[in-house]
Curated annotation (Swiss-Prot):
Tagged with keyword Transcription: no
Residue ranges, annotated region (Binds Hjc): 366-645
Stated name of the protein: ATP-dependent DNA helicase Hel308
Motif placement: DEAH box: 148-151
Catalytic activity annotation: Couples ATP hydrolysis with the unwinding of duplex DNA by translocating in the 3'-5' direction; ATP + H2O = ADP + phosphate + H(+); Couples ATP hydrolysis with the unwinding of duplex DNA at the replication fork by translocating in the 5'-3' direction. This creates two antiparallel DNA single strands (ssDNA). The leading ssDNA polymer is the template for DNA polymerase III holoenzyme which synthesizes a continuous strand
Activity: how regulated: Helicase activity is inhibited by Hjc and by PCNA123 and PCNA323.
Organism: Sulfurisphaera tokodaii (strain DSM 16993 / JCM 10545 / NBRC 100140 / 7) (Sulfolobus tokodaii)
Keywords for this protein: ATP-binding, DNA damage, DNA repair, DNA-binding, Helicase, Hydrolase, Isomerase, Nucleotide-binding
HAMAP family: Helicase_Hel308
Amino acid sequence: METISIDDLPLDIKIIDILKRRGIRTLNPPQSEAIRKGLLDGKRLLVTSPTASGKTLIAELGMINYLLSKGGKAIYITPLRALTNEKYNTFKDWETLGIKTGMTSGDYDTDDAWLENYDIIVTTYEKLDSLWRHKAKWLNEVSYFVLDEFHYLNDPERGPTVESVAIRAKKRGIVLGLSATISNGKEIANWLNAELVATNWRPVPLKEGIIYPEKKGFVVVYKDNTSRKVYGDDAIIAYTLDIVSKGGQVLVFRSSRKLAENTARKIVQYMNFVKLEDKKLLEIARKIKEVEDAGSNEKEDLYNLVLRGVAYHHAGLSKGLRDIIESSFRDRILKVIVATPTLAAGVNLPARAVVIGDIYRYNRKVVGYMDLIPVMDYKQMSGRAGRPGFDENGEAVVVVRNKREAEKVYERYLMSDVEPIESKLGSESAFYSFLISIIASEGEKTTEELMEYVKETLLPKELAKKYFRSGLDWLLQHDIFAEISDKITLTRFGRRISDLYINPFTAVTIREALEKNEKGCEIAYLHLLAYTPDGPSIGVSRAEEDALIDELNCELFVDEPEDEYEFSNYISALKVAYIVYDWVNEIDEDTILGKYGIGSGDLRAIIDTMDWLTYSGYHVASVLELKDHKDILEELHARVKDGVKPELIELVKIPGIGRVRARLLYQHDIKKPEDIVLNPEKVKQLLGPNLGEKIVREAARTIA
């Protein structure tokens, strides 16, 4: 595949200069092929290629060229918030051309009018869906859509929104899809009305292999029929030490957090034999100790690991800890990260070698049942192998128990194509949300007009019709849709559901519980919200089940279900309710983490979700004019974000004051913003002169 020099591109010289400043002189094969297929002519394209093959630059060239020649706005859409930050920082390069980049994610109940001043907007699929529902006026200026990580169409949770966004995007402008390699790329490209650019080119060649026991050690057998031996008692440790001793970095993937943490602790015991940058590692370890958004135990644990060049990484860690670990690995100071597979789908973090420690993971719905990981997951993990500019080859190895299992794994993962992408709108929850989204963003429709959008989905036609009929009936029956003069429109209740961006089953569950019950205890409200489809899920041990039920001293809004699967959701929601209850009653964070066996990242995720759900519950109660419930939920919402009792609500509204500082001030008779302004010297004495002065100024602004 021929490459193209950037000097030969029909681009503004200022664009060429920025590329040269980045060190780019020649486009790589996927980029060159995208140019040949019409990228700079505004053609719709679906680009499928491996990780780190330069797809982001394809999007940049397409967007910048279009904006400079045609005007308007472009939107770059990702499935993950971490990726929005990464892309936002990359696109800021173009501000010297007068092209401003903005970023938005989360906070679904707003139209983000401030974004009208930006040319490129980086956001998530869910956020764009919510912006369309809010009919943000500036969206009318958007005519170029980049659909990043488009293989997320196949993700059971994110896929429905990706598909819904793609359907509307292709009706509104030019679409550029960027995806990992997929087996039915031609079909998906046709669905997007786009030309396919498909390539398996990688910047660093990948050696794929399998490692299994043989005599006194382990043998690594590669796809190219070469092999080599590594020695030790454990395959992961033996292989990892072999790579690290040669100056490489290793990403080890384990199927659970516990396995990731234990594997990291095992590896670190052998790192004394490896040459490390001790001073830099000590500096990183000290940074970990200083992180404010993490628990003491996890900081201490990681501190000791990082001193020897090893860390673990999973969603249970706080963002502050994850950021330090990621940046230290990028800077090549950390040598080994042991992670759960979520890292493979997130930020760009390549290593010389990838070890896939488990090909099975627990089935979320069937207790005790293990599933083989999809081929796509294997490709995503193995695709992290090889750092451009540092490694001649990347290596990805799968750990298996014996030669017989090696043969099966070889056929399933190393020799197979990834699974074809299929619609994930095939559930009541996903499809009904899709119908709400279309009416909210596109306006009232006849059933025939609405059916035209349904025909645009990737669902088989008969299945789509079935869901359409049942969905329409259910949404009309539950007062979410109304039919007026042959047009389907949103009711007041339906509009609020759409604006809040909650699942319709969540809204109906809340409504039915609140209408049926008088005022309840705080645990009852928190449990109800956590039990909805939008509620956070968390593991509960058998011992915890009994303790949670024994601790319950008030009546819940939801009856205990007999179904085993539903009971697991019910008890998980009860655990979440108690976590949040302790949080809003100002229990110390370390105590909460220890009591419930969760990480600081888990706590933050639970708080963020319950912040949104208490806000949503309060607004649902408001629409239904259920004043008693509304008042309780409104106060709960005010307390959840900062984790405070009712008397501290006014104090934590002041920027710079969190739960600890608010309680300190309250204990010294400073109970509201006015008290801060009237007692500046006392505040400075309690909080220190610099912070105290800042807080006094902020309090004055609050009451102005």
